Amino acid sequence: MKLLLFAVLYLGYQGILVNSQCVPSVTTVSGSHAPQGQICSGQMIFEDNFNDLDHGRWQHETTLAGGGNWEFQWYSNNRSNSYVYNGVLYLRPTITSDTTGEAFLTSGTLNIHGGAPADQCTNPSFWGCERTGTPTNVINPIRSARVRTVNSFAFRYGRIEVQARIPSGDWLWPAIWLMPKYNAYGTWPASGEIDLMESRGNRHLVQNGVNIGVEQVGSTLHFGPYPGLNGYPTAHFTRNSITGNGFNRAFHRYSLEWTPQGITFYVDNMLIGSVNVGSGFWDRGGFAQHAPGTENPWQHGSVMAPFDQEFYIIMNLAVGGTNFFPDGATNPGGKPWHNESPQAATDFWNGRNQWLPSWNLNEDFSREASLQVDYVRVWAL
């Protein structure tokens, strides 16, 4: 009896020791694929190595909206545009007219309201659920993919690492980023945006003597009281590769550490930029000086606001648009549209003989033109 009692007490003591090794983390999580219970410091709270495409974890967006930048792609859920092969997720561009016919782009009506839950249009803004093509405003000429964890996983504070290879091809726009689960401080950019990695697929896009295509990646924070007042120039960082050895040549690790004191970005464990919260993002953006009388949307939040809420993960391959590719940059063959053009998508499509060969769509299932993601991992602080 004494031996049994001793064993019970010993095992209970061991359990206390094991439990005491968990140092509670300031990280918070939510969602169907988020861990339950106490979050411990250093705990891995999300991981996908892409042994398969988990649709419960990654929701596909279905929209024509253009990402707020009048981009030229139609995001859809099909295995031509998103698939897993040999442990890698591919987000792949295809040509819309390959399935609809060329005439449909200038005369057809595309309605993407679906009857099944997974087929519903996810963003109706900017005619995102239905468009009618005309000779001057073609229906989105490219199909691509955008996936997100909005329902499955969101977190506040932690470290995220994504190993990815950016695509090669003119006017391709890969992005890995985070958006707020709830717009606690209002619509964009009042509730913030965290861009872990953005790049351009052009091999030889040059501005002011610098390759801003595949040899450059960027990380950015967006924040401000309204779209016309955005403090991102104070929190935008870029890193360039060695000339001739762009980020499209191999997989690279893109990571950030997000704490109650700030956000720091890394590429292959090398610092790309850091944002310390200081007295807050209102002061960082200088909004009181730039727009006197504007109300601070974060006045009732913490000093880290708007980056004191849970964010979810997004990965996508966009194409073109009227914001990200500067008109003043030089590119072999030129740029077929201007950012101020009222028919930018049409101009882009009409210039396809210039850019389409650079995508190499007929080689190796166009993997070179795809955003390739090896893994996504998130740890608690």
Region locations from a protein language model:
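GH16 jelly-roll
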Residues: 20-381
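Cleavable N-terminal signal peptides of Sec/SRP-targeted secreted and luminal proteins
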Residues: 2-20
